[in-house]
Every structure is written in C-alpha cells, then in structure tokens.
Amino acid sequence: MFLNRFARFYGIPVIDVGLAMQRRDDQSFDLFARVSTLVVGHACLLCGGFIDPRRAREETLRRTDPNAYQKLKEEAYVLGEGDPSPAVVTFTTEAASMAVNEWLTGITGFAGPSGMLPTRIRRFHARDERVLGLPPKPDCPCCENPSTLGRGDVTPFIDMVS
C-alpha cells in the first residue's frame, strides 16, 4: 500500500518486484516472478490484485503491535501461510533483471514510445512470460483519485493513518 501511495503522491515511478511459489500438490510447485511499474496510467498493485488490503493490515499489525497480531492469529483471524517463500538465487536474480530492464526501458525509451510495461509475469515452471495490461479500476482509492496525483508532502504522510 505504501509504494502505491508514494508513487502517486510524489509522481515518482516505482518498480515493484515479487516472487511467489504456489503449491500445486504435495511434491510440486508453480513459481512466478512479477514486475509491476507504478506510473500514471498503469494499474496500481491494488487494482492488479497483487496486494491484499487485509494481509497488508495484518503485516502492519505484526510490526507495530505483535501482541494484538498474536491474539488475532490465535483467534484464526489471520490469513494462513500455506505457501513457501522462495529465495533461490537464480530466480530472484532473474526477477531483479526483469525490473532493471523495465527501468532501462523507462529512462532510454529503447522499447519504443509505449514505455515501461504495466506488469510482466514470468512463469518459471512453464518457461513463459505474460504481459498484463490491466487498466486502473475506476473506483480505486489510490490510482484513480485525482487529488493525490503529485500532491507531495502532506500530514499525515501520504494521507496514511495507522
């Protein structure tokens, strides 16, 4: 949520990288890398469905109030942690290279006038790549609010209340 708002309020392009491993069955996994560019006209991470506001709230609570987080976890109000978090150097390095390529495209224009792609997803297990051109959602509180574009410094910082 922070990166979305930071890019929007300050008009600074942000490149977000994610790596996810999803359990297919007891012995195999699907492995994905995602690179999203947060610039005007591209869908934000919320619009693209790449972040879950509930999980973001839980992660904030875990950092800021571990006791309250633990209580919610004990009451089964915290989302599960069923999929592993990958840290395989070849895959993380490739995901980082995808992000650097988008940055180079953004500053040099070598890929043409369309600029950076909104979202690229590499499916390592299938050995392919997909480009998602998701439009911003009309009711998005982050990327479709005209009052936040280039707003800069405000109190509270980027209108975030914890």
Give the positions of each predicted feature.
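Generic recognition of flexible, low-complexity loop/linker segments
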Residues: F2-L3, A87, R127-E129
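Glycine-rich beta-alpha junction loops
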Residues: L19-R23, I51, F124-A126
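Active-site proximal loops enriched in glycine and acidic residues that flank catalytic Cys/His/Asp
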Residues: G18-L19, G48, T92, E144
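Phosphate-binding loop/pocket of nucleotide- and phosphate-handling active sites
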Residues: T105-S162
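Adenosine-phosphate binding glycine-rich loop
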Residues: D26-P118
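Rossmann-fold NAD(P)-binding glycine/threonine-rich loop
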Residues: M1-G41
